[in-house]
Amino acid sequence: MASKSGDGGTVCALEFAVQMSCQSCVDAVHKTLKGVAGVQNVDVQLENQMVLVQTTLPSQEVQALLESTGRQAVLKGMGSSQLQNLGAAVAILEGCGSIQGVVRFLQLSSELCLIEGTIDGLEPGLHGLHVHQYGDLTRDCNSCGDHFNPDGASHGGPQDTDRHRGDLGNVRAEAGGRATFRIEDKQLKVWDVIGRSLVIDEGEDDLGRGGHPLSKITGNSGKRLACGIIARSAGLFQNPKQICSCDGLTIWEERGRPIAGQGRKDSAQPPAHL
């Protein structure tokens, strides 16, 4: 299963744009992140309104810490702790009812991929998470195809050698319906999944060990609740944008708007905090 935040793991670098105007802003950021378990190093650049955090925490948790200072923060890029850009991607998940989430993929090295994210609106408990073959949402999640499985293997758990490449195991939603997770995977590569889809399921994935007819096919994790196409995203220092060329919104205005649709133009739209 996915690790809980602060439980260790491989350090990555997160690049945030943070609204800062003076030295007291810088001091507030340092004070908030100092001593936080999982935060290894913090570089604050006032002139660039940038905060670079070396951490093992999910990006959403670091963003929440930064915004607890009363300043808006926007994740602009991710990279390895050596500040290398080996590939990054993102999936915006939408589905049944109020379920929505953001999941990011980062190639930490040629052997290791980080998958981290936050999904809201789930029933408390374990939910199977998988990369699927197709980035086709024409019939919602039903047109995403089977699990990504270029090797023709049986379904298994993320620690198994014999498994679908897209088998990411389970993530746990807490009592409030939010799942925040950080997975390190040795089989998945960012460059292999761009253009495919990510799907979260209704129930727990039995990791191929349940004895059900679907155990070795899907993990018997129930219907598909939410999904999104995996798209390339910016690595470290690859996103200098301050104003969106398509509609003139600043990154701070975008922070509280949907990525697309009518709600993007609605100034009263509350932030999703994803």
Swiss-Prot record:
Renumbered residue ranges of the record's region Superoxide dismutase-like: 88-234
Binding site for Cu cation 2: C244, C246
Binding site for Cu cation 1: C22, C25
Positions with a binding annotation for Zn(2+): H147, H155, H164, D167
Cysteines engaged in disulfide bonds, as pairs: C141-C227
UniProt KW keywords: Chaperone, Copper, Cytoplasm, Disulfide bond, Isopeptide bond, Metal-binding, Phosphoprotein, Ubl conjugation, Zinc
Any single GO CC term annotated in Swiss-Prot or TrEMBL for this entry: mitochondrial intermembrane space
Tissue: Ubiquitous.
Xref: InterPro entries: HMA_dom (IPR006121), HMA_dom_sf (IPR036163), SOD-like_Cu/Zn_dom_sf (IPR036423), SOD_Cu/Zn_/chaperone (IPR024134), SOD_Cu/Zn_BS (IPR018152), SOD_Cu_Zn_dom (IPR001424)
Cofactor(s) required for function per UniProt: Cu(2+); Zn(2+)
Protein family: In the C-terminal section; belongs to the Cu-Zn superoxide dismutase family.
Known role: Delivers copper to copper zinc superoxide dismutase (SOD1).
Name of the protein in its database record: Copper chaperone for superoxide dismutase
UniProt source species: Mus musculus
Lineage: Eukaryota, Metazoa, Chordata, Craniata, Vertebrata
Gene: Ccs
